[in-house]
Design a protein with these regions (language model features):
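Charged, non-catalytic interaction/linker regions at domain boundaries
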Residues: 1-177
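Amphipathic, oligomerization/interface secondary-structure segments
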Residues: 151-274
C-alpha cells in the first residue's frame, strides 16, 4: 500500500521495521519518503517578516509518500491474482495498512512528545495505490504492477451536517461538550487498536456525558439513550480498571465498543434536537 499526503506526517524519512514484539520476525516495513516541492523555501532561509503581495500565488507544499510493505513473499504466479483480490477488498486492505502507518505516526507522537502530530485517514490522501514489486522497487515508489484507487466516496449528508454544526458552534448557537471530544478520542484509539487508551478515555467520556447531557433529558430520544447508557457504566469502569493493570480481555474490548456506540447515539440524538 502506498499513499501520498500533502505536508509532513511526523516521522522523518526512512524505513521502519514493524514487529509484533521484540525479536519477532519483521512483519512489515513502513517507508516514509519526501517529495520536495519545487518552490519550497529552505527552512530558515528567511527569518524576518516580509510584505505580503495581494493575490500572490501560494507556495507549493512538500508531499510525503508513505508505503507499507508486507514482508511475506508473493509467488510470481499468484501476484496478479493477489492484486485483484486486494482491490476488491479495498476497505480491508487499505484499513489494515493504514493502521500500520498510523501506528508509526502515533509512535512518533510519543517519541517526539508532540501532541500536535495526528493520525491520517484515507480521505486525506492525495493518492492511494495497491501494488506489488520487489522491496527496493516499492520503497522507491516503483512497482511491477499496481492500481491507483479513486478517493473514497462521502455521502452528501456527511458533507453538509458538519458544516452546519460548525456554523452553529462558531455563531454561539450550540456548545461543544467535553464528552464529545473525549468520545472522539476514544473512537480514534479503539479504531487504531489501542484498547487500553480507549477504555480510559471512554470512562471519562461517560462521566462527562451523564453530567452534560442531563440538560437535554426533556428530549425523549436523549433521555432514552441516556438511560441505556447507564447500563454500560459498570462494564466500562471494569475495562478501565483492567487497562490500568495492563490490558483488556476481548470481551472487555467488545464492552467498550458497545458503550461507545451508545454514547455516539446519544450525542446524535442531542444534535437532532437543535
Amino acid at each position: 500500500m502506498q499513499w501520498e499526503f500533502a505536508g509532513r506526517l511526523g516521522p522523518e524519512a526512512g524505513r521502519y521495521v514493524v514487529r509484533r514484539y521484540a525479536w519477532d520476525d519483521p512483519r512489515h516495513v513502513v517507508v516514509i519518503g519526501e517529495l520536495e516541492a519545487p518552490r519550497r523555501r529552505r527552512l530558515g532561509a528567511r527569518r524576518r517578516p516580509r510584505a505580503a503581495a495581494a493575490g500572490s500565488v501560494p507556495d507549493a507544499v512538500d508531499v510525503t509518500r508513505a508505503t507499507v510493505i508486507a514482508t511475506d513473499p508473493i509467488t510470481d504466479d499468484g501476484a496478479h491474482r493477489w492484486l485483484e483480490e486486494a482491490v476488491k477488498e479495498r476497505e480491508r486492505t487499505v484499513g489494515e495498512a493504514l493502521a500500520l502507518l498510523n501506528r508509526a505516526i502515533h509512535g512518533h507522537r510519543l517519541a517526539a512528545a508532540d501532541p500536535y502530530v495526528g493520525e491520517v485517514s484515507e480521505a486525506m490522501a492525495m493518492a492511494t495505490r495497491i501494488g506489488y514489486g520487489s522491496g527496493e522497487q516499492v520503497a522507491d515508489g516503483d512497482w511491477e504492477e499496481a492500481r491507483e484507487l479513486p478517493p473514497p466516496e462521502l455521502k452528501r449528508s456527511m458533507l453538509l451536517t458538519p458544516q452546519q454544526r460548525l456554523a452553529a458552534l462558531l455563531a454561539g448557537r450550540d456548545v461543544a461538550l467535553a464528552c464529545e471530544d473525549l468520545a472522539l478520542r476514544a473512537r480514534l484509539d479503539l479504531d487504531q487498536g489501542r484498547g487500553r487508551e480507549a477504555a480510559l478515555q471512554l470512562s471519562l467520556a461517560l462521566d462527562a456525558a451523564f453530567a452534560e447531557l442531563e440538560g437535554w433529558r426533556a428530549s425523549e430520544a436523549v433521555a432514552t439513550r441516556l438511560d441505556k447508557l447507564h447500563e454500560h457504566r459498570e462494564p466500562v469502569a471494569s475495562a478501565a480498571a483492567a487497562a490500568l493493570q495492563g490490558g483488556l480481555q476481548p470481551e472487555q474490548t467488545e464492552a467498550v465498543e458497545a458503550a461507545l456506540q451508545r454514547l455516539e447515539a446519544a450525542l446524535r440524538a442531542r444534535l437532532a434536537e437543535l
